């Protein structure tokens, strides 16, 4: 279940092995293709603004990849994840991808009570009431997590109160040991001891932003610890509106060749999120904040290849 990277620390194509610690030459893996990105649709139609609302280009990039699965990494419809906004904006460009979409909710989806717009739009694909689930793709095991549950509730401006964030109030209890999501994840990973495993959620445990919500990140850490303990290879997240790739590390941010490799792919077309100038996050291998685009991964039997693909009309990296 573990991995060693091969290739340069660039945004281009590299291959990683899930098991034995040996390097291979940069090349394309053979297997199912996934596209992954979050932080997508503005509450307005696409435009040519320099920094925002170009999610139509991202949808086009995904279609050109013809992936077997699209992992939608949360904050899919701004500002509040209302069902009417999903229909008016997100659906206009992503409807034909719905049958291959595997979504997770972000914080903006949960600004509507019980994330009603998100669960209504995606239906069974969102796996209510909790929003966590797993599935197989090729030889890989993929796990979708609801990281917003780690807060236990979310601030909803319209309601002026803390509001539940799933369709079942009984589930809004956080994500640490003893909670429904944590215990489900623990059992799922033991039940599916795949050679290669990928987890995806909206929130990254590490990144570039100086989060003001440290308590929330503390609550999120148990999920990452469990993923690391169970030998998960890759974690995909969004939330920060840029692209970042990290070297393997443990759940405390320490470099570890047997740790989790984290990708942050918040380049779905809503807005750019500036990376702090002159600051390099610990263990970060690559990053960019000036191109909307998609992470393309090929999931081989014992390895995977990955590359960041800029959307049509965006700056190439």
What residues fall within each predicted segment?
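Bacterial N-terminal signal peptides that target proteins for export
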Residues: 1-8
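Residue-level marker for buried hydrophobic side chains located in beta-strands
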Residues: 34-36, 70-72, 103-104, 199, ...
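Extended active-site neighborhood of metal-dependent phosphoesterases/phosphodiesterases
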Residues: 45-47, 63, 78-197, 212-234, ...
